From Swiss-Prot:
Pathway: Amino-acid biosynthesis; L-histidine biosynthesis; L-histidine from 5-phospho-alpha-D-ribose 1-diphosphate: step 1/9. Coiled coil: none annotated. This function is generally fulfilled by the C-terminal part of HisG, which is missing in some bacteria such as this one. It holds the Pfam family tRNA-synt_His. Keywords: Amino-acid biosynthesis, Cytoplasm, Histidine biosynthesis. GO terms for molecular function: histidine-tRNA ligase activity. The lineage of its organism: Bacteria, Pseudomonadati, Pseudomonadota, Betaproteobacteria, Burkholderiales. It comes from Burkholderia lata (strain ATCC 17760 / DSM 23089 / LMG 22485 / NCIMB 9086 / R18194 / 383). This is ATP phosphoribosyltransferase regulatory subunit. Belongs to the class-II aminoacyl-tRNA synthetase family. HisZ subfamily.
C-alpha cells in the first residue's frame, strides 16, 4: 500500500483552498465578534459520554471511538462542537444571563454525509445561551444570513420549521406519542402512505393534523393555511407566530416554510432554520433552538445557534482569496532587511526570491517589486 494514500473521504487541503478557507474563517469570526460573541476552543477529544449527550443515534454513529491509554475509558473524536460549547456554558462559565459564544474547529465523521463529502469538516458557528425569547432566534438567524452574505453568496433560500408543532400534537394524544419515533421517520421521509397507516386509528383531529404536515410547505402564506388545518393549541399558535416573525425578519433571503421538515427534531425544541442556494442539494447552514442541550451537564438553559462547514462554504463561495504580494530580492543588506521588515509590519506580504529561484509560484500575485533606487529600497509596480 502506498504511504501517501489517505483514507476514503479524507483529503489534504492545498494552499489555494486553505487560503480561501482561512479568509472566510477570519471574516466570519470577525463578524461574530462584532455582534459580541466570545471565542471558545473545545478539545478535539473527549470522553464519549460527554460528546453524546444530545443528537441521538445519528451522532453516536458519526463519532469515532477509541480507548484512552491512560484511563482505559472510551474516548470520542468530536463529530459536533455544539454539545461541547453547551458544556462550557453550563459547567465552566456558569454565568447568569445571556452568554454569546462562537467557535471554529475540525470535526470528524465516521461516515460521509454524501458520496463525495469529506469526513473531516471545519465547523464554525455561534450560540446564544440564557434567553428564551424569540429575540435570540432572530439574532442568530440574522447572523447566519450575514455570514453567508460575507461569503459572497446570493439568492439564499431560508427554510423555516418548528419542532413545537409535532411536539404539541404528540403531547395531546397518548396513542400518537407511543408511535412518536415512527411518526417522525414517516414525516422526515415524506412517506405519506406510512404516515396514513400510522395515523389511521388516531383521533380525528390528531389524524388530520399529522397528515396535513407534509403538505404545509410554501412561502410565508402557508402559515395562514396552517392556522386553519392544525388544532388551536397554545403551543402551535406560538410556534406559528414565531415562524411569522422569523420569516418577516429574514433580510436578504427567500423564505420557505416547511412544517413537515423535522430533521433534527430530536435535538431541537423550537424554531429550526436551514439555508440553501441553487445548485447545492444539501443545506449549507443549519440552526435553531435547543433549550435542553445543557441538561446533561446539570444546567439546562435556553439556547439557540447555527453552524456550517467552512470547507463546503469555501467550495461554493465566489470570494477570491488570492493575495497580492511584493517580490523582493534576497541579499545580506541591512537596508533591504529593514525595508522588508517595515513592509511586513505594515501588513504587506513580501516574498524574497531565494538565490537560483527567481521565479515565484503563482500562489500569490506579485504585483509589485522592492527595488533599489538611488541607495533606497522602494516599492514599484511590476
Amino acid at each position: 500500500m502506498s504511504t501517501w494514500l489517505l483514507p476514503e473521504n479524507i483529503a489534504d487541503v492545498l494552499p489555494s483552498e486553505a487560503r480561501k478557507i482561512e479568509e472566510l474563517r477570519r471574516r466570519l469570526l470577525d463578524r461574530f465578534r462584532s455582534y459580541g460573541y466570545e471565542m471558545v476552543m473545545p478539545p478535539l477529544l473527549e470522553y464519549l459520554e460527554s460528546l453524546l449527550t444530545s443528537g441521538g443515534a445519528d451522532l453516536r454513529l458519526r463519532t469515532f471511538k477509541l480507548v484512552d491509554q491512560l484511563s482505559g475509558r472510551t474516548l470520542g473524536l468530536r463529530a459536533d462542537i455544539t454539545p461541547q460549547v453547551a458544556r462550557i456554558d453550563a459547567h465552566l462559565l456558569n454565568r447568569q444571563g445571556v452568554t454569546r459564544l462562537c467557535y471554529a474547529g475540525h470535526v470528524m465523521h465516521t461516515r460521509p454525509r454524501g458520496l463525495h463529502a469529506t469526513r473531516e469538516q471545519i465547523q464554525i458557528g455561534a450560540e446564544i445561551y440564557g434567553h428564551a425569547g424569540l429575540e435570540a432566534d432572530l439574532e442568530i438567524q440574522q447572523l447566519m444570513l450575514d455570514a453567508l452574505h460575507l461569503a459572497g453568496l446570493s439568492r439564499i433560500r431560508l427554510d423555516l420549521g418548528h419542532a413545537g408543532v409535532l411536539a404539541a400534537l404528540l403531547a395531546r394524544d397518548a396513542q400518537a406519542a407511543e408511535r412518536g419515533e415512527s411518526l417522525y421517520d414517516a414525516l422526515s421521509g415524506k412517506d405519506v402512505p406510512l404516515l396514513n397507516e400510522l395515523t389511521d386509528d388516531l383521533g380525528a383531529d390528531t389524524r388530520a393534523a399529522l397528515r396535513a404536515l407534509p403538505h404545509l410547505y410554501g412561502d410565508a402564506s402557508v402559515l395562514a393555511e396552517a392556522r386553519t388545518r392544525l388544532p388551536v393549541l397554545p403551543e402551535i399558535t406560538r410556534a406559528l407566530d414565531d415562524l411569522a416573525q422569523l420569516a418577516a425578519q429574514a433580510k436578504g433571503a427567500e423564505v420557505a416554510i416547511d412544517l413537515g421538515d423535522l430533521r433534527g427534531y430530536a435535538y431541537h425544541s423550537g424554531a429550526m432554520f436551514s439555508a440553501y442556494i441553487d445548485g447545492v442539494p444539501n443545506a449549507i447552514a443549519r440552526g435553531g433552538r435547543y433549550d435542553h442541550v445543557g441538561q446533561a451537564y446539570g444546567r439546562a438553559r435556553p439556547a439557540t445557534g447555527f453552524s456550517l462547514d467552512l470547507r463546503e462554504l469555501a467550495r461554493i463561495s465566489p470570494v477570491e482569496a488570492r493575495g497580492t504580494a511584493i517580490l523582493a530580492p534576497w541579499a545580506q543588506d541591512d537596508a533591504l532587511s529593514a525595508a522588508v521588515a517595515a513592509l511586513r509590519d505594515a501588513g504587506e506580504v513580501v516574498i524574497q526570491a531565494l538565490p537560483g529561484h527567481d521565479h515565484v509560484l503563482d500562489e500569490f500575485a506579485c504585483d509589485r517589486s522592492l527595488v533599489e533606487r538611488n541607495g533606497a529600497w522602494v516599492v514599484e509596480p511590476r
